[in-house]
């Protein structure tokens, strides 16, 4: 089986995440997608609680699965002590699914920081790296390129960010065009991101 791993803080999950999951399913012919909620060692603090982020990731996988069961959410990274590192998640998933071909799905920003990741040179031995590149970044030097990490780039440009969504919610602005309906409802119902 081909298993995609898509990690992130999902604070909150948005339409860009949803589109990336669906796009990856078709383009990469994935059999399974694991959406892993993490603590990003390069970001300072989450804005929603771990429980809220896990709940919203489950809602994201429900949206992805509307066309058939494919995605599952994981809170394994949050359940471990200390910082969360991609290489540890990959080792864990490789132990769970030893016969699967693993594909790590990352966005442009994460890909650009890959050279700073713990055990970055080990990652290609555990999985194929697929990054979703944004227009305008193609000529930039990346840490991952400097390490000669083998990657597959997929052009994908969906200009929506969790930072902007949090800012809009805090300002009392609607975000219904930026997040799936179930996540929009969850944010409102739980009063997330209000200042």
Swiss-Prot record:
Keywords recorded for this protein, A-Z: ATP-binding, NAD, Nucleotide-binding, Nucleotidyltransferase, Pyridine nucleotide biosynthesis, Transferase
Pathway: Cofactor biosynthesis; NAD(+) biosynthesis; deamido-NAD(+) from nicotinate D-ribonucleotide: step 1/1
UniProt KW GTP-binding keyword: no
InterPro entries in alphabetical order: Cyt_trans-like (IPR004821), NadD/NMNAT (IPR005248), Rossmann-like_a/b/a_fold (IPR014729)
Domain of life: Bacteria
Enzyme nomenclature, EC number: 2.7.7.18
Catalysis: reaction(s): nicotinate beta-D-ribonucleotide + ATP + H(+) = deamido-NAD(+) + diphosphate
GO molecular-function terms, A-Z: ATP binding; nicotinate-nucleotide adenylyltransferase activity
N-terminal signal peptide: none
UniProt-listed Pfam families: CTP_transf_like
Gene Ontology biological-process entries: NAD biosynthetic process
NCBIfam families linked to this entry: cyt_tran_rel (TIGR00125), nicotinate (nicotinamide) nucleotide adenylyltransferase (TIGR00482)
Family per record: Belongs to the NadD family.
Its job: Catalyzes the reversible adenylation of nicotinate mononucleotide (NaMN) to nicotinic acid adenine dinucleotide (NaAD).
Protein name per its UniProtKB record: Probable nicotinate-nucleotide adenylyltransferase
Organism this protein belongs to: Chlorobaculum parvum (strain DSM 263 / NCIMB 8327)
Species lineage: Bacteria, Pseudomonadati, Chlorobiota, Chlorobiia, Chlorobiales
